[in-house]
From Swiss-Prot:
<comment type="similarity">
    <text>Belongs to the cytochrome b family.</text>
</comment>
<feature type="transmembrane region" description="Helical">
    <location>
        <begin position="33"/>
        <end position="53"/>
    </location>
</feature>
<keyword id="KW-0999">Mitochondrion inner membrane</keyword>
<keyword id="KW-0349">Heme</keyword>
<feature type="transmembrane region" description="Helical">
    <location>
        <begin position="77"/>
        <end position="98"/>
    </location>
</feature>
<dbReference type="GO" id="GO:0006122">
    <property type="term" value="P:mitochondrial electron transport, ubiquinol to cytochrome c"/>
</dbReference>
<keyword id="KW-0830">Ubiquinone</keyword>
<keyword id="KW-0479">Metal-binding</keyword>
<keyword id="KW-0249">Electron transport</keyword>
<feature type="binding site" description="axial binding residue">
    <location>
        <position position="83"/>
    </location>
    <ligand>
        <name>heme b b562</name>
    </ligand>
</feature>
<feature type="binding site" description="axial binding residue">
    <location>
        <position position="97"/>
    </location>
    <ligand>
        <name>heme b b566</name>
    </ligand>
</feature>
<keyword id="KW-0812">Transmembrane</keyword>
<dbReference type="GO" id="GO:0005743">
    <property type="term" value="C:mitochondrial inner membrane"/>
</dbReference>
<dbReference type="InterPro" id="IPR016174">
    <property type="entry name" value="Di-haem_cyt_TM"/>
</dbReference>
<protein>
    <recommendedName>
        <fullName>Cytochrome b</fullName>
    </recommendedName>
</protein>
<dbReference type="InterPro" id="IPR048259">
    <property type="entry name" value="Cytochrome_b_N_euk/bac"/>
</dbReference>
<keyword id="KW-0472">Membrane</keyword>
């Protein structure tokens, strides 16, 4: 008796793409963090863009604009919390991604590693300028 996921025409496509993926056996859950970084970055950009549509940076009205976002904008509270927690999740994924590279010895690929370190410094500088200084 054969498995339906290997014989059904539609399930066969899904099976070959997701279940029986032609990937090495050493591929572990540590390799997800690069794609999670992309997802977190996309969420940060989108939520930041939508929050910036309603935010005013004037010192007299900044707090009122945040309360306006949370109370009057549809799902504004969700956008604000996604943006705040997405930044933390981004850095958790970033540090785990670097940790995976250290664990598996990716620092031996010096050109790729140096580009990654430059990107890490750029991300940290951007976070400092955008979140710590204001």
């Amino acid at each position: 008796m054969t498995n339906i996921r290997k014989t059904h025409p539609l399930l066969k496509i899904i099976n070959s793409s997701f279940v029986d993926l032609p990937a090495p056996s050493s591929l572990s859950s540590w390799w997800n963090f690069g794609s999670l970084l992309g997802v977190c970055l996309a969420v940060q950009i989108l939520t930041g863009l939508f929050l910036a549509m309603h935010y005013t940076s004037d010192t007299a009205t900044a707090f009122n604009s945040v309360t306006h976002i949370c109370r009057d904008v549809n799902y504004g509270w969700l956008l604000r919390y996604l943006h705040a927690n997405g930044a933390s999740m981004f850095f958790i994924c970033l540090y785990l991604h670097v940790g995976r590279g250290l664990y598996y010895g990716s620092y031996t690929y010096s050109e790729t590693w140096n580009v990654g370190i430059l990107l890490l410094f750029a991300v940290m500088a951007t976070a400092f300028m955008g979140y710590v200084l204001p």
